[in-house]
Amino acid sequence: NKLIGVIREQGWKRLFQIIYEVKINNLITKFVSIIFRRSGLKNIIVIESHNDFDCNGGAFYNYLIEHGYNQKYLIVWLLKKKNDIKLPYNVKKFLLHRPSILKSYYISRAKIFTSDNEVVPKARDDQKMYYFDHGSICLKNCKPFFNMSRKKIDYFFSPSPNYDAIYCNQM
């Protein structure tokens, strides 16, 4: 049993951490998504990046701010670490691995998701997920470790045309 394996290998504390950070978070998002499933999508962009405010997600965020897209879109950053950085108008931040009803609301209503590292599951089929790869992968079979699928990602940006066939094979 997978649950018993987690307890044996990582202990009860890690089990409760997984339940809190992942399972409760997903449950809240599913519940909020059910409530708003008939509501239209809003001009919300959800960004996740490898480290907070960096990689391709950071470059995309900088582009959005420099070109005033935060005037039309609410930009929601999903952070891995608590951060006291001051954000410009119409930009909000939430911890990726902490339950939040407001974060779940934004996830359930967002038009666009971007990710560099951890793919945040779309709540609805009419949302679009863009994956910005942040580097090259090893030239070996990564399929067992590649936690992405064509169901989760609508558009995949690779670092080079030379990697396109490799990525397509891995998904």
Which ranges hold each PLM region?
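Membrane-proximal basic amphipathic "stem/tether" segments
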Residues: N1-N43
